[in-house]
């Protein structure tokens, strides 16, 4: 298989974890006979420094022409006073690609469960599906005076139906349960959200649906996260709750994410930030980036076996006691990546010997 992947290393630790992603992809090429054209493009703060824009037109054009996009990290205090903020480029990239579904799997390795703030963290295994294109971030009018500020929250039926349908399709391949999170006791947009969700649910009789108000959901994520399978919610609620959920893993360096469009390339990235305090020190945890690669292989390219091989290698290395500083170990970014690649190679040899 041949695929073109645009690599947006970005800022902070982004270039370091992107290098890990590339090395893992090269190992997949060698072990399974695929070929990936990896195209580097400027994005975020580094793009501002070079072009004055966080998302240069050349970068967006390259992304649109690709089969998938990998993003390292974006932003940092260096650009706090800049006219253009790096994070603005991420919103523009999502809009340009037309991605509407942000997918964050939240799982906890038994080897790192002790790092979670919760007891029985190894029972956590759910996915947060967040709507990305509507809601309060993208609705108008928006206005502010010295005395009054106004934001508008708008959702169209087709936006709700599209994201909820995606969540049900995902749940039908997992534990067959969807939890829809809204504020239907107060917000008109949430009342429509709930109505459309119930209509979609009729098409999936084998999938259980439950509704939870967002304030109760925030509590349940901490009190009983094992109850969840697929969570689906609107943009603002999803932004907040997915960050809350990510803390359950004990380190932001562990979890990947994907953003999908109806047509065209998807965007894959670790959920962690640019971590400027450790940038360039070979300390960044590359697991989330490597898992983003695994998601890309499975979800965009249909290479489920190859994606699983990466996941299994990561788990095996963690079981051996090797891990980076953020999860209690002494491995560097490069040494942990090397260990994962070695494990992938060994597992492939064992598989061929059967």
UniProtKB/Swiss-Prot annotation:
Places the protein is found: Cytoplasm
InterPro entries: IsoCit/isopropylmalate_DH_CS, IsoPropMal-DH-like_dom, Isopropylmalate_DH
Listed cofactors: Mg(2+); Mn(2+)
Gene3D superfamilies: Isopropylmalate Dehydrogenase
Site (Important for catalysis): residue numbering on this chain: 137, 183
Any one GO BP annotation for this protein: L-leucine biosynthetic process
Catalytic activity: (2R,3S)-3-isopropylmalate + NAD(+) = 4-methyl-2-oxopentanoate + CO2 + NADH
Pathway membership: Amino-acid biosynthesis; L-leucine biosynthesis; L-leucine from 3-methyl-2-oxobutanoate: step 3/4
Residues that, per the record, bind Mg(2+): 215, 239, 243
Pfam family, any one: Iso_dh
Binding site for NAD(+): 76-87, 273-285
Record-annotated disulphide pairs: none
Gene Ontology terms: cellular component: cytosol
Cofactor binding description: Binds 1 Mg(2+) or Mn(2+) ion per subunit.
The entry's keywords: Amino-acid biosynthesis, Branched-chain amino acid biosynthesis, Cytoplasm, Leucine biosynthesis, Magnesium, Manganese, Metal-binding, NAD, Oxidoreductase
Recorded GO MF terms: 3-isopropylmalate dehydrogenase activity; magnesium ion binding; NAD binding
Highest taxon listed in the record's lineage: Bacteria
Residues that, per the record, bind substrate: 94, 104, 130, 215
EC number: 1.1.1.85
HAMAP family, alphabetized: LeuB_type1 (MF_01033)
UniProt subunit comment: Homodimer.
Assigned protein family: Belongs to the isocitrate and isopropylmalate dehydrogenases family. LeuB type 1 subfamily.
Function: Catalyzes the oxidation of 3-carboxy-2-hydroxy-4-methylpentanoate (3-isopropylmalate) to 3-carboxy-4-methyl-2-oxopentanoate. The product decarboxylates to 4-methyl-2 oxopentanoate.
Protein name: 3-isopropylmalate dehydrogenase
Species, as recorded: Bacillus cereus (strain ZK / E33L)
């Amino acid at each position: 298989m041949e695929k073109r992947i645009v690599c947006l290393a970005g800022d902070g630790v982004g270039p370091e974890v992107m290098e890990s992603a590339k090395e893992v992809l090269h190992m997949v090429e060698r072990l399974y006979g695929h070929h990936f054209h990896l195209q580097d493009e400027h994005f975020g703060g580094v793009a501002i420094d070079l072009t004055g824009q966080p998302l240069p037109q050349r970068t967006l054009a390259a992304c649109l022409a690709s089969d998938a996009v990998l993003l390292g990290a974006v932003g940092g205090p260096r650009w706090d006073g800049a006219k253009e903020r790096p994070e603005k480029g991420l919103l523009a990239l999502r809009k340009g690609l037309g991605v509407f579904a942000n997918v964050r799997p939240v799982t906890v390795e038994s080897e790192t469960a002790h790092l979670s703030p919760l007891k029985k963290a190894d029972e956590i295994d759910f996915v947060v599906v967040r709507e990305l294109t509507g809601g309060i971030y993208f609705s108008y009018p928006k206005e502010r005076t010295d005395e009054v500020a106004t934001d508008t929250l708008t959702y169209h039926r087709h936006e709700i139906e599209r994201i909820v349908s995606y969540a049900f399709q995902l749940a039908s391949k997992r534990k067959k349960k969807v939890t829809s999170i809204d504020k239907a006791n107060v917000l008109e947009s949430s009342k429509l959200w709930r109505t459309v969700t119930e209509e979609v649910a009729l098409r999936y009789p084998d999938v259980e649906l439950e509704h939870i108000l967002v304030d109760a959901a925030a509590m349940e994520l901490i009190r009983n996260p094992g109850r969840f399978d697929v969570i689906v919610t609107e943009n603002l609620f999803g932004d907040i709750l997915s960050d809350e959920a990510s803390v359950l893993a004990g380190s932001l360096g562990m979890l990947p994410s994907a953003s999908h469009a109806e047509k065209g390339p998807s965007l894959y990235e670790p959920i962690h930030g640019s971590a400027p305090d450790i940038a360039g020190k070979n300390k960044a945890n590359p697991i989330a980036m490597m898992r983003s690669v695994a998601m890309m292989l499975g979800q965009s390219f249909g290479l489920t076996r190859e994606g699983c091989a990466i996941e299994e290698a990561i788990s095996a290395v963690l079981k051996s006691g090797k891990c980076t500083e953020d999860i209690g170990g002494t491995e560097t970014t490069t040494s942990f990546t090397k260990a994962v690649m070695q494990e992938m190679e060994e597992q492939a040899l064992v598989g061929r010997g059967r």
